[in-house]
Amino acid sequence: MKAERDPSGARRHRWPAPLAGAMLADPRLGESGPELFNPAHYGERARPVDAGGRQAAWFVQGQGWQGVLRRYRRGGLIARLSRDTYLWAGEARTRSFREFRLLAAMRAQGLPVPAPLAAAYWRQGPTYRAAIVVERIPGVRPLAQALAEPLWQPVAEAIVRMHRAGVWHADLNAFNILIGSDGRVWLIDFDRGTQGGLSDRQRQGNLQRLRRSLVKVAGEDGERFWLKLRDSYWTAWGVGVQP
């Protein structure tokens, strides 16, 4: 496979038939190929992620790196028709390449997101399948498991930083916010996320999605956490506490 340089800084490899696809890979991964996206390739160094991922995510370990491999899967009713294929609209619009490039851009801006390690798509006629590998952050737990702790301010500040960078998260919930052992906040899962031209409505939508998630996870305790997070968000945004 001949490698090209992607604007994200990754190496871009195009696969010949019959694979009919391409991949992006961090130079740290060396001369890697499609095997990166096959859990069987890692043997005992791969294990399923306990929660989320629609049974399509694994913790994997390579030579000098640890990551999370995720295959893109549909949810909801449409999954009954097509579990893992998407309509082809050009390479730049594949879910894997878009998420990889968004994460790379966010990392370059110093935002608290995992490093993208590799992304791929496999095209078949008018459809394609896709997968991504992102850096595994050691020693973290989801916000959903830490609501008894006074974390609303650092969580709010992380969201404000994301929004100030013009980034919209497609599913900001209590499991896509991770808390490190040092108290650092990380934001994950930017599938379908975008950057640029973030509207007030999109920001409010992110916040309300998180509120629903917190209440679903912890009921009244989740609502109390949300109210403190909301006030911290608006204070960090610079407009003071909002009603």
Locate the predicted segments by residue:
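Conserved ATP-binding subdomain of kinase catalytic cores across diverse folds
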Residues: 32-141, 160, 164-165
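Hydrophobic residue at the +6 position relative to the catalytic HRD Asp in the kinase catalytic loop
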Residues: 172-179
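Juxta-kinase regulatory segment immediately upstream of eukaryotic protein kinase catalytic domains
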Residues: 1-47
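Short, basic, helix/turn surface patches
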Residues: 138-151, 219
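C-lobe/activation-segment region of protein kinase-like
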Residues: 180, 185-243
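Conserved alphaE helix
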Residues: 150-158
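Conserved catalytic-loop position in the HRD/HxD motif
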Residues: 166, 171, 189
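Charged catalytic carboxylate motif
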Residues: 98, 154, 209
